[in-house]
């Protein structure tokens, strides 16, 4: 019996609808195939502390989809500390026309992400095994996103060299990070803050959008 059932498909479809994210049959199939890989590989690779497939739908898939409206601009995106691929893999599935780079320093996690790329045939997805400080792309990214990666201060400092004046930094957080905002480097500013309602997720979710000031 597959770990991914019609129940999970229904939960994904219902949650995406609540978020206002349009999922055609192919995108839903790819997201569920990704979920199946995450469940399978998590047993050996410890990709996420979430073990229950029901929780994975809400806390990983729907949480990733909650930022889709804020990631529509820009063609070249970086997911820093991608881990098990959230939100980078769902964004690559939702936006096949965009280029998504998934960066992580953990070899087990990048091996998993490479397998996801191959099995789901995600031609727009690139996996990079590197520490963020050592990563030197050819050009700045249009958007840089992180989910439970670091403090806002570290996120800004460690990725400063990866973006420019037009880049948007998207930081996915739980409770509103008031103390972290107080430590934000002077050359960064908060462009927008959004409280996110993720179907099936308990607790607060916030998205902070940052830009460089210099």
Curated annotation (Swiss-Prot):
Superkingdom classification of source: Bacteria
Catalytic activity entry: guanosine(527) in 16S rRNA + S-adenosyl-L-methionine = N(7)-methylguanosine(527) in 16S rRNA + S-adenosyl-L-homocysteine
Localization annotation: Cytoplasm
HAMAP family noted in UniProt: 16SrRNA_methyltr_G
Protein family (similarity comment): Belongs to the methyltransferase superfamily. RNA methyltransferase RsmG family.
Its job: Specifically methylates the N7 position of guanine in position 527 of 16S rRNA.
The protein's name: Ribosomal RNA small subunit methyltransferase G
Species per Swiss-Prot/TrEMBL record: Pseudomonas aeruginosa (strain ATCC 15692 / DSM 22644 / CIP 104116 / JCM 14847 / LMG 12228 / 1C / PRS 101 / PAO1)
């Amino acid at each position: 019996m597959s770990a991914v059932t019609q129940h999970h498909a229904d939960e994904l479809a219902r949650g995406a609808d609540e978020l206002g994210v349009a999922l055609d049959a192919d995108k839903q199939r790819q997201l569920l195939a990704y979920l199946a890989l995450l469940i399978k590989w998590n047993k050996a690779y410890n990709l996420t502390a979430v073990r229950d497939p029901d929780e994975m739908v809400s806390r990983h898939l729907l949480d990733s989809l909650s930022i889709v409206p804020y990631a529509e601009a820009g063609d070249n995106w970086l997911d820093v500390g991608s881990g098990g691929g959230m939100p980078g893999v769902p964004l690559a599935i939702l936006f096949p026309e965009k280029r998504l780079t998934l960066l992580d320093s953990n070899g087990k996690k990048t091996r998993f992400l490479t397998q996801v790329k191959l099995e789901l045939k995600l031609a727009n997805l690139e996996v990079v095994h590197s520490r963020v400080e050592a990563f030197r792309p050819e050009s700045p990214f249009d958007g840089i996103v992180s989910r439970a990666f670091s403090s806002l201060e570290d996120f800004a400092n460690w990725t400063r060299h990866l973006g420019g004046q037009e880049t948007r930094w998207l930081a996915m957080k739980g409770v509103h990070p008031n103390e972290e905002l107080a430590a934000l480097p002077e050359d960064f500013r908060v462009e927008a803050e959004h409280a996110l309602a993720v179907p099936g997720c308990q607790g607060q979710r916030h998205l902070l959008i940052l830009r460089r000031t210099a």
